[in-house]
Amino acid sequence: KHQGFKQMITLEQAWQAVHLVPDPEIPVISVTDLGIVREIQIKGEVVHIALTPTYSGCPATQEIQRDVEKALLSAGASSVEMELRLSPAWTTDWINPEAKEKLKRYGMATPSKCASPAAEQVIRFVPTLKENLNCPLCNSNKTERISEFGSTACKALYRCLSCREPFEFFKPI
């Protein structure tokens, strides 16, 4: 819990402030685009925010918490309480459609649907895909996986056989 100057902030202002916080590992999308901001409530002078990390060991979680808190305090919150919600587990289905388009323009492929139904599930970082991935650069479906892990555990590295460019794939979780 962080205490700051006593100012009032509306729920709409809180959501707007948090929407401006970029994901530290994929800065072209915000933490709200990614779907990890699960809830914001204002109770008195305290902004309560619930975040669900992309996975429980995500190394960016603390940085995201700091950035979200800073954004809320800058927007006029006088106090912020953060909750990490690990259940239900985050799924790539929570990435909003606009963010998927931003990721494609950034050169990253996203799954069309979750690997398994949203419920209690085992998170697997090795993709078991039954679909051909389209290259986010040229849209060819002639692609191959180079590595099961990309720059982070939740991404895999692929290469397009048509344009020969490498790209990352956000694994279905």
Spans of model-derived segments:
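Domain-level signature for proteins that mediate thiol-based redox and metal-cofactor handling
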Residues: 4-173
